[in-house]
Regions:
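Sec-dependent N-terminal signal peptides
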Residues: 1-2
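C-terminal motif of bacterial Sec signal peptides marking the signal peptidase cleavage site
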Residues: 5-8
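Transition segment at domain starts
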Residues: 10-62, 142-161
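Short, structured coil/loop segments at alpha-helix boundaries
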Residues: 28, 61, 66-68, 116-118, ...
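Phenylalanine-focused residue identity feature
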Residues: 42, 65-69, 103, 128
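Short structured motifs
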Residues: 46-53, 65-67, 96-99, 110-114
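Mature extracytoplasmic domains of secretory-pathway proteins
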Residues: 51-94
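Short, solvent-exposed, Trp/other aromatic-anchored flexible loops in extracytoplasmic proteins
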Residues: 87-149, 160
Length: 162
């Protein structure tokens, strides 16, 4: 009788990584989990403007934008990429924004952030990418036993067409 024993750590059988498709960027988006299922959370760019950052005014204009998350709570805390874009929707600068950042002074549900871009005069808007970036688990390569599964797309970055 031959007994074949395989350690979960040495076997890639049954472990698979999948990457979600990037969702349609917009001023107001419904956040999507990694499987593509929409959450009951909406992220919205309230407004934006070009102005010097008060802590580094010598660096010139940056993109200052205000945003809100409707439907988020302490248990969901999704995160989406925010990107300043040009007229062709090419990202000029991006950063990940978490829903917990959307709480301003005096209980306001509106947060604000800054995006530094190389050519601020090209900015025509700020868009959110709807894919939830709040959790990225280990890959099969990193942990063959417990890793794998659906993953969000790579974070948006300058040069991406949204």
């Amino acid at each position: 009788m031959v007994v074949l024993a395989l350690s979960g750590c040495s076997s890639h059988w049954g472990c698979a990584d999948t990457t979600a498709e990037r969702g349609e960027a917009g001023v107001r988006v419904r956040v999507e989990e990694v499987t593509g299922r929409p959450l009951d959370v909406f992220a919205e760019v309230v407004d934006w403007r070009l102005e010097p950052h008060p802590q580094v005014p010598a660096e010139g204009d940056q993109v200052h934008f205000r945003f809100r998350f409707d439907g988020a709570d302490d248990m969901t805390d999704p995160a989406v990429d925010a990107c300043a874009v040009d007229e062709e929707r090419v990202a000029l600068g991006c950063r990940t924004i978490h829903s917990y950042q959307a709480f301003g002074p005096n209980g306001s549900p509106i947060g604000d952030e800054w995006l530094a871009v190389a050519d601020p005069e090209r900015v025509t808007g700020v868009l959110f990418v709807p894919n939830d970036q709040s959790y990225v688990g280990p890959t099969c390569e990193e942990d063959a036993k417990d890793g794998g599964g659906p993953r969000p797309p790579e974070p948006a970055r300058a040069g991406d067409r949204l």
